[in-house]
């Protein structure tokens, strides 16, 4: 389903369904023998919505017809779980480092099914603001409440579309822009047009003071590469054709239709220009650092995103 200017979605639709895919990877990592992260709530979300393509990571075996045309698919899925686990660990550590250093306000942009407000050991007095579409936040809170889960911090849900005036909504929810804060933008950039990305950062700039921090999963150098896009599209069309025959109930989202393939300013450069200290870690380096490097056969199928960490001077 192609994007429109004011589109919205249920958790099983469009951008919402991609959050279930991330939850599936986190659940798979949590079940693994030596998990890098622990997200006990990821499987709770999957159980709440029932069967779908997002459950592939928990399937005992992929369809034989699928493995016949994509023999490396299990390795690719394993690599994506490792990518998501590394990404999750990066943001977990970023938030905990900042809050343990005395920052008392955390803001999660496009929170999706992120359960950090429930699962991380936040310092006493920390307030976590979660921003996302109303139906996504409602589903998350209701599902976790049904399972008796309680936030481990002062969680504040800010139900707002990031294309709207979310800074006003954030301030009205109790956010104090006069004291340091820590922010995340994880899994968000491809869903924003270039102009919206700039506006997002400008708004963060207007809500932060010295010593504030932000971590961003930025688009990597191959995001716009036409050959990379063509290869991914062809591979996914082969998979869709098989799945339409053997498991038609598992519709595979056309992710490329949800993303904005536009030239945009490098995220690290943007924050440097606006007086932030910046470090950038390529995804391959991040994964290797966690001992989760992708297998050579499929390393070209793992996102080449950049993990940006910045602190305002």
Curated annotation (Swiss-Prot):
One GO process term, biological-process aspect: methylation
Signal peptide positions on this chain: none
E.C. designation(s): 2.1.1.-
Regions annotated as coiled coil: none
Top-level taxonomic group: Bacteria
Xref: Pfam families: LCM
A GO term, aspect molecular function: methyltransferase activity
Sites where the protein binds S-adenosyl-L-methionine: 132, 161-162
The entry's keywords: Methyltransferase, S-adenosyl-L-methionine, Transferase
UniProt function note: Exhibits S-adenosyl-L-methionine-dependent methyltransferase activity.
PANTHER family attached to this UniProt entry: S-ADENOSYL-L-METHIONINE-DEPENDENT METHYLTRANSFERASE YKTD-RELATED (PTHR43619), S-ADENOSYL-L-METHIONINE-DEPENDENT METHYLTRANSFERASES SUPERFAMILY PROTEIN (PTHR43619:SF2)
Family: Belongs to the UPF0677 family.
Protein name per the record: Putative S-adenosyl-L-methionine-dependent methyltransferase MMAR_0955
Native source species: Mycobacterium marinum (strain ATCC BAA-535 / M)
